[in-house]
């Protein structure tokens, strides 16, 4: 911009050029960007392919979006439960508002977790920013993603697809723990959240959730 101001100032160019087009320049500014885009595209396609390729999973988790909470299943362990946001009046010290849930996802550290994502009603999106994960939850379709967390801790996410009046009240809470703690949790979870026993309770919770609307 400064170069143009100096180069084509009135003092140096009392009679301005009236050139309307230049074929060579037009060809160059069309061809050169195309070449650059092609060069960038080759490694980009490789990265996109790798991004969609899921490594062999150590843990498989299924996330089902409902209006307005998440349901989870560990199909290999026959575990199923719902995860509902804790209301303000029920929060305990240290629990973040609009993010804490009554039942948490638990996964082991340094393990590949494959997530199968779907919906039971409208479109939702399962997103945990710290994992770099966001996938749409669509009824009748299963989308896949994965993550591998290298640090123990509590990670939060939310539904990222506008899904109704309580869209903002669909948090995701993931506890990443050691393998020993995960094994202990599995023992308790298999007793508390056995998939067959949870079918009726899940239907009841759905009904109650709708009645609160």
Language model features by range: what are they?
Residues 2-213:
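Non-transmembrane, membrane-proximal soluble domains of secreted or membrane proteins
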């Amino acid at each position: 911009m400064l170069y143009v101001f100096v180069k084509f100032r009135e003092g140096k160019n009392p009679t301005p050029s009236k050139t309307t087009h230049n074929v060579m320049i037009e060809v160059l500014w069309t061809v050169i960007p195309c070449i650059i885009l092609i060069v960038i595209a080759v490694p980009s396609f490789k990265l996109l392919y790798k991004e969609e390729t899921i490594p062999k999973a150590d843990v498989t988790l299924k996330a089902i979006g409902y209006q307005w909470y998440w349901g989870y299943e560990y199909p290999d362990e026959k575990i199923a439960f719902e995860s509902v946001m804790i209301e303000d009046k029920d929060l305990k010290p240290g629990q973040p508002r609009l993010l804490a849930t009554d039942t948490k996802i638990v996964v082991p550290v340094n393990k590949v977790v494959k997530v199968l994502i779907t919906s039971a009603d409208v479109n939702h999106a399962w997103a945990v920013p710290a994992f770099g994960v966001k996938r749409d939850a669509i009824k009748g379709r299963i989308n896949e993603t994965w993550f591998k967390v290298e640090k123990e801790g509590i990670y939060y996410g939310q539904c990222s697809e506008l899904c109704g009046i309580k869209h903002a009240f669909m948090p995701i809470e993931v506890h990443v723990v050691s393998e020993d703690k995960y094994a202990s949790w599995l023992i308790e979870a298999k007793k508390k959240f056995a998939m067959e026993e949870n079918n009726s309770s899940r239907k009841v919770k759905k009904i109650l959730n709708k009645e609160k609307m």
